[in-house]
Amino acid sequence: MPATDLNTMPDHQPNTQQILAAGPKPRIAFATMVGDEPFFLPIWISYYARFVPKDQLFILVDGAHRILPPEADGCQILTLPHVIPGPGWDHARWAMISAFTTMLLGRFDVVVFNDVDEIIVADPDCGTGLIDLIARARDVGVISPFAIEVLHRTDLEPAALHNRAPILSQRRYGRINASYCKPCITARPVRYSLGGHYSDYPDLHLDPHLYLFHLRFADYTMLLARQSNRQGLMAAGGKGGDAVAGAGWSKGAAEMNDFLQSFVKAGPPIDTDFSFGWQRAKITKSWVHDPDGGIWRHDKLHNRKTYTIPPRFADIF
């Protein structure tokens, strides 16, 4: 099936009513699933609430014991029974998420599902807003944004991340990680792979103007704390390792430290126009059906090169 590039931001705090009033409104739902996320969930809510009313933000909550931030008031909250992780746990979770997004498509034109530390942004230079770019999924079925993994380059930005200023004004560096060019903008029912990295949808539409910023590695201390929590979840389910969730869930503090330091050792950040033409072409050309998983996927593309995130993105979220 074809793999193609789609061809044809607001400032940090735009007027939500102006965004919602600009032309015909496609019905778009944004959804995520969380445990305890006191830092990233308020960012996720505050960002997407600038584009759609809060009742179009859906939050699946893993367990009634979770504490939600005040920003969640007005969002669609679905509290689920907590399930102790065991073999097959994350596969079952993503099967549930696939079914949930399909259900939402019964009432919405497009559903955008991401982990809470993944933010989709329209390139401010493209001249088209986030909602209009996302709405193109109605024509093509499924859209994947280009993925940038935001890095904490402790040698260049030693200060801890905080919520008193936009994230990308504090973290100006990232790397390419094609695994996060996820088929996360859907106007058709899909069955997601583990982690939502791929799906059974046969066409790849890698949008030239949409970026997914993955924030997992944006702060060293926060990374270690979240990773420790994930390891605790894995341990609660007993033995199982990668059979419980993705391999990244079981990595320890030393591995996380070595990962971030590997970018420091690899050299200074590279300044580019942020179009990443050959990388996009490689992702597109590698599109293939995986019969074992019953999914369509592209090659992984990542290395230890650090890229400077252009200043035009600094105040978006």
Explain the meaning of each model-derived region.
Residues M1-P42:
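N-proximal low-complexity "stem/linker" segments adjacent to membrane-targeting elements
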Residues S46-D55:
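Short, acidic, metal-binding catalytic loop of nucleotide-sugar glycosyltransferases
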Residues Y48, V112-I119:
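Short acidic catalytic loops
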Residues V52, L104-F108, A137-R138:
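A structural signal for short coil/turn segments at secondary-structure junctions
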Residues D55, D109, D117, G141, ...:
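Conserved acidic residues
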Residues F58-V61:
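Short internal beta-strands
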Residues H65-F113, A122:
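Active-site-proximal specificity loops/subdomain of glycosyltransferases
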Residues D90-A95, A122-F317:
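Catalytic-site signature of metal-activated, phosphate-bearing donor transferases
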